[in-house]
């Protein structure tokens, strides 16, 4: 049990935590804010925190009863300024560089004491390019200059992204194809690897950053180990109790399939690059994951949930 999943009768003694949630996005580096946000809301409530959610229209349902849901978009924060009233901490997910400053002004006016950014592994690459081209790094820099205590979280791909339909492209069509003909068709099936983290583990990292000063002013690499494509397929097959066919495609063939599924070229490029890179440099990148401090294990106080765990919880999506 997470150290952040305590007795649900814990008394409420803290201010409001505002979580921002947007519709599923397929651009590279995006995490499924709805799935992560719902895990986070449950964990914060179990800690005795008050939770408010600013959610885009298609994300307003299926929250715990005690969550205060306000319809609005963090990409247009001035249209929903009331969501910031009385807020102590903000989980900033789905923000846009063009309007993030408006959100930070509202947070500062509300006397918010902390902003935790759901970022990406893009900033370390964006640094090599002119500031006007930045996306993730622009958001991080704006938060750092806001005068509010901050933490940036750069996660691996989230296991639940396949359910919400967000980045990465690998695995995104598996529920449909497995229901249709029981065959997975992707590039780099044999050597491809991709790093994943369970959404509940990522939420526990966020909960720690929101409710503790231990991680203020730090960048947390919330990374899970690289998983081979074949191991993910085998996990699903074992849970289904049947074999799953696998056809290894060329990168161009995989690209064509993902384009037909409306994936943007940027997300496809990054997915293919990562599958190949993590496969070719597996030992090195596993070591990089193990070397990160604080580790996810350190922060949440238990081993990370596995892909087998996730599949067991979500197997109906593949039936």
Regions found by a protein language model. Give the residues of each.
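Short catalytic/ligand-gating loop segments at beta-alpha or beta-beta junctions
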Residues: 220-221, 248, 270-275
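A hydrophobic C-terminal alpha-helical subdomain
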Residues: 253-319
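Cofactor-binding loops of NAD(P)H-dependent oxidoreductases
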Residues: 72
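SDR active-site lid
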Residues: 236-242, 248-251, 263-266
């Amino acid at each position: 049990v997470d150290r952040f999943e305590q007795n649900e009768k814990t008394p409420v003694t803290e201010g409001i935590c505002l979580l921002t949630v947007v519709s599923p996005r397929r651009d590279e580096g995006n995490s499924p804010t709805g799935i992560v946000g719902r895990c986070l809301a449950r964990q914060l409530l179990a800690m005795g925190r008050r939770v408010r959610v600013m959610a885009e229209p298609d994300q307003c349902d299926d929250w715990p009863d005690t969550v205060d849901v306000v319809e609005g978009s963090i990409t247009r924060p001035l249209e929903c300024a009331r969501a910031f009233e009385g807020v102590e901490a903000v989980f900033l997910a789905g923000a846009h560089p063009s309007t993030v400053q408006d959100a930070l002004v509202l947070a500062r006016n509300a006397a918010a004491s902390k902003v935790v950014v759901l970022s990406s592994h893009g900033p370390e690459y964006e640094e090599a390019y002119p500031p006007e081209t930045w996306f993730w790094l622009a958001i991080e820099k704006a938060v750092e200059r806001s005068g509010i205590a901050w933490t940036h979280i750069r996660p691996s791909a989230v296991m639940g992204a396949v359910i919400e339909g967000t980045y990465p492209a690998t695995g995104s069509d598996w529920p449909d194809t497995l229901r249709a003909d029981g065959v997975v068709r992707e590039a780099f099936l044999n050597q491809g690897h991709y790093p994943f983290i369970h959404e509940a583990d990522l939420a526990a990292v966020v909960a720690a950053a929101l409710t503790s000063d231990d991680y203020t002013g730090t960048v947390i690499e919330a990374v899970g180990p690289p998983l081979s494509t074949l191991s993910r397929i085998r996990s699903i097959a074992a849970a289904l109790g049947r074999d799953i066919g696998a056809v290894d495609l060329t990168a161009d063939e995989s690209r064509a399939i993902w384009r037909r599924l409306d994936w943007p070229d940027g997300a496809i490029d990054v997915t293919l690059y990562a599958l190949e890179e993590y496969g070719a440099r597996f030992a090195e990148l596993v070591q990089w994951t193990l070397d990160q401090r604080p580790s996810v294990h350190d922060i949440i106080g238990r081993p990370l949930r596995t892909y087998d765990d996730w599949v067991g919880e979500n197997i109906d999506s593949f039936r």
